[in-house]
Amino acid sequence: CVEDFPYYKSVGYGGLPNEEMIVELDAGYMDGNTMVIGAVAGIKDFANPISIAKELSKDTVNCVLVAEGAEKYASKKGFERKTMLTDRAKQHYRKRVKEVREQELKPYDGHDTVGEVALDCAGKIVAGTSTSGLFMKKAGRIGDSPIVGGGFYADSEVGGATATGLGEDLMKGCISYEIVRKMKEGMGPQEACQRTVDELDAKLKKSRGFAGDLSVVAIDKDGNYGCATNIQNFSFVIYRENEEAKVYLANCIDGKTVITAASQEWMDQYMQERMAPISE
């Protein structure tokens, strides 16, 4: 499980902490058949927040819980408690504090979400997210990941989408819902993703002069996928039954997303960078 792999610093065990050096996790889940949702935000010291979010989706009300309320629920349901702050994450934190002090860099460096949209053989679409959020965020900060329509959305009659990037900006466009809405109107997933990212990127730049990172992935009810981004080297994976998983890179070139297969060299370098010793 990605949430359990300590070298992915944007999610679960090994995720980067907030400004108080505490790991706060967010996760969300949606079933496109029944439209049920579940989400947790600001939850501490639980190993797999996406599983807690899925369990919450079984409830008609009280299906989105935060902080202490989410932790009490998880304990009652028997979910595993685990200290999520690793020694490696502490090293990242100390290094960033030093860089902020000595180089006047911004503390908010590093944000990513593990998002997934899946279609099964019966036509059911689900979407989910899990993240430790913005590195050195303020305690209690919540981004788009656990917000239905922002970080994730699923409708089995149409498709599903998930998003990653700067949560405060992604939420402003209800970006995952907007992609699914466009697909419902007849757009394919690639066009829906590209148009939605373009529109939000342009609106943010018009209103304040810049846009944060915006990256999205979607599938339609027929299993076609799309991806769009306003950054460089956004990676995503496509997996089909009885096939090997394929890693792709998306790059924003002249305002449009160009998707290419990731080379083995790129994937090796990716893992080397994540597992390399940290120099403080």
Question: What residue spans do the PLM features occupy?
Answer:
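Alpha/propeptide regions of enzymes that mature by internal proteolysis
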Residues: 1-280
